[in-house]
Structure formats: C-alpha cells, structure tokens
Amino acid sequence: MRRRRLAPLLAVSLTATLAPVLATSTAAPAAASSAASSPSAAKGGALDRYTKQKPKWKRCEAAAPAEFQCATIKVPLDYRAPGGKRIDLAISRISSTGPGKRHGVLLSNPGGPGGQGIYMPLALQEELPEAALRKYDLIGIDPRGVGRSTPVTCDLTQEEENWLRPYKKETFTKDVAWARKVADKCREKSGAVLPHITTRNTARDVDLLRAVLGEKKISYLGYSYGTYLGAVYTQLFPGRADRFVLDSAVDPARAWRGMVQWWAEGAEPAFDRWTGWAAARSETYGLGDTPKKVDRTFWELVARADEKPIELDGLLITGDDIRGGMRGAVFSPQSATEAFVELKKAADGETASAKKLAAFTGSAGTGAAREAVEVPQDNMTASFWAVVCGDNSAAWPRNPERYRQDAIADKGRYPLFGDFASSIKPCAFWNRSVEPATQVDNKAGSLIVQNEWDSQTPLPSAQALNKGLKRSRMVTVLGGEGHGVYPSGNACTDGTVTGYLLTGKLPARDVTCRATAESNAEARENQQREEIPGSPIPERAPDRF
C-alpha cells in the first residue's frame, strides 16, 4: 500500500460529522511531580467525582469503522478550583489489535493550537505499522476549548480571523484597532473560559485522561504544537511519560511570539536555497540562470503586483500576497518554482494554472469547520489565540508602538515575511496569563524528529527542544522537506521511530537520516492539496503550528 505522510493536521475538520457521544465520566490522576502541577493537589478529595466515573464508549458514527469509538469525559475548567465549573473533553479510541501484546495507550495530537485530535486514531490506524497497532490503544482528544470539547468562540468574521498582516504605515492604525477588537470580542464571548484554555491545563487533562483509562503511564505522538504539549506534559508529570515522540518541534522558550517570528527568520535561508534551485534549472523555468537573477525576478514581480494586483482565476494577488505565500512555499523549491512561474505568466497576460498555486495559497482548513453544525465557525482561531496569548502573555509587548518598530526592523532583516511575523497581534490586548510560562528542563526521555527544511518549526527550534529535554534523542532528516516526518516511507526515520515505540529504547545517540526522493515528492504533493486523500482532516495550515 502506498503510504502518505502523516503530516501535522493543523486544522479543524468536520467533513465527517462526528455524532456527539455524551458520557459524563472522568478520573483524577495520582500525585504528580509537584503539588502545583498535579490535579490531585486539590484538597479534601475534591476530585473524587472525577475518579469514580468511567467513559461510556460508543461507536462514533454509523459511517465510521465499528472499532472507532467515542466518549465524553468531564474535566475541571480550573484545576485550582476542581469543585467549580466542569467542561467536556471529547475523546476517541481504536483498541489494540493484539491484546496479548498490548503495551498501553498512544495518545496523539495533530498540532494547532486549535486542531481537533479526535480523528487522529483513524489516520494512525491507516499509517502505523501493524506491530504498533498491536502494541497500543490509539487515543485521540479534542483539546479543551476545541471542536467537541466545550468549544470557545470569539464570534469573529472571516476578515477578523485573518491575522498575518503585512506592516504598512498607512494601515497600521487599522491593524491596531483590529487586534484590539479581536481581544475585546474574545473577552465578551468567552471571557470566563479563555483564561483556562492553556497548554498547561491541556497537559493536566491528558494526565487526568491517563488515570481515567487506568494507565500508570502514557505514550504520546505529537506533531508541531503537539510537541509543545508533549514537552509541557513531561515537565509537569515526568514520571508518567512513557514513550514520547515529538515530531516537528516547537522551542518552548519561544512560545509564542518568538515562534511566529521564527517563520520569518527560517524563510530567509529557504528562500536562498530556492533561488539556487531555480537558477540551476533556468532552461526549464526561465527565472534566471544565477541566484541573484532569480532573486531580482522575484522582487520585480512583487513590485508589479503591489502596483497592479495579478488576476488569476478570480483571485487578485498583491505583492504582499506573493511574499506571504512564498514564505511557506520556498521550503519545497520545486513547488515554489512551479507556483511562481504561473504567477509570472498571469502577470504577463499568459494563460496560467490556478491549481499550481495551491502550494502558495494553501488553505488553513476553515471551510469544513464553517459547515459544521455544533462547532463555532471561528473555533480554531479563538482557541488558537487563547493558547498563543494565554500561555505566556509576558512574551507579547503591550505597547503597539513596539510592534510597529519591530515590524519595520524585521522587514529589513527578513524581507520575505518579517513584517507579517512581528506586526501587531491580539495578544497585545489580551488579559495577563493566570500562570507563568512553562520552562521545559527535565530528564524525561523523548524522541524528537525533524526535517531540515520545515516551514513551520525550523530546525533550530527542534534543536532547542532537544537541549531542554536532557535525556531526549533527535532524528534529523537532512534535505527533508515539509512539516511532519513520521511516518514517511523513509526507512531510516520510520525504522528509528517505530523501533522506539515498540521497545521503548531510545537510540544511543542522535540520529541523522537523509531524505529520500519519494518522501520529499510526497511532501510536495501534499503541499499542493488542501487535504490528504482519505483523511477527514485538512493537511495544510500555513498560519498554525
């Protein structure tokens, strides 16, 4: 069977509407690594009503495989006051295919923040080797505030959800007003809940779920933002982390403004690589026979589109659109070149293919969510801001003037995307975090997996996480393109990760693999789709982790 890359699934998707399965059951974990981090730190048995409940599993929907089961458990909104308001946590499972060989449970997270994880067991069932399916019950959750787990909303319009905005002197005042309005609307619609939609609380939910399932430890496969969730879990509950695979990693020290800014920093070497790639194939693509000439061709088209937007298949594409789209596209030079050639054709009045622009204008996946009945249309964006602003409000300046200065400076340093990354965001007007940021510095063993050319979590980000997790090992895929590594059909990476999941033994030292032509071709193919064939969850979201 042809394998497809199980890349980070960064968008809400309800293309297959999951019938709500309402079971009010939960449990509390045993003592954690510290009283401050443990749900069981509650006094006087306040979590007893959770510990005595059990999930009531039911088939998720008639059209889904019978083994794909769903339930809903209850968790405290505020772990400091577990006797107060409770919220739903939607969970799913596919049980081990070899009960006699079962090791435990493998929880997964697709990324985001704001990505639904309830469908992950279905995707993993198709992609993981049979030996792993025998070893684990596959567990999925919609993190708190997301999807079926008491979804939050800010009642944002589609225009208000558009948050990667280039800096322009003449529009900055409007951008500040937009950022303030988003923060105000979020407070108005979900103010009582949003302060508790954080990664630390989601990690506590994961540990509570571990106890509900009757497991002493939990294994984990997290992509992109999911690597940060996994790292925070190991910090709060190091003794309960079993086999942790962190694919396409976030640097905890840069959560979250620094990670957005890393999109701009990481794009510059990728852009230079692209100009060299295109120049070496000038006879095919005609963009210039030296990197300098390709660079000039690119910026000339940006300038033309800023003066007169390019019209293609009903789209009007500005120079800012080209810069923003190219930021992610250049990490796959072939896809970027093909897309740019079509833009140039359209600008020159020639017939062009809008389909080839998919690598350029990849969907954030909100379309399916807008058709859903029970999930607010802006849920992914609302939950994204709750986490990105609420995890570490200290990372976000409060003075709009600081954003203006940073955007101007970073556009100079990183001309492709610097102003997009550093300009004003709603976090400037967000309430202060209820807890301090999580410093990840522990000895829980984890396996970090990272492509060299990743548009969302650059290689230095994974290297930083590897340094913070003292007993971790890292698999680096030299020449690897795309966001998300495992499984990819690459014998080196797949063998290392699967071996760890099956045995629990980390490699003796960090591992370096080389990308294969097939795995990079799949990355390019996936980049040009809005969703992976056969998956209910869209593949790409260029404005998420």
Give residue ranges: language-model regions:
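Catalytic histidine-centered segment of alpha/beta-hydrolase-like enzymes
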Residues: 481-491
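Conserved alpha/beta-hydrolase "acid-adjacent" motif
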Residues: 455-460
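Catalytic-loop region of hydrolases
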Residues: 2-12, 23-169, 203, 292-295, ...
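Alpha/beta-hydrolase fold nucleophile elbow
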Residues: 213-225
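A catalytic-pocket lid/entrance helix-loop region that shapes and gates access to the active site
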Residues: 153-164, 232-296, 344-355, 359-365, ...
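Glycine-rich nucleophile elbow surrounding the catalytic serine of serine-hydrolase chemistry
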Residues: 116, 204, 222-234
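Short beta-strand/loop motif that positions the catalytic acidic residue
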Residues: 442, 447-450
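Alpha/beta-hydrolase fold active-site neighborhood
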Residues: 295-443, 489, 538, 542-545
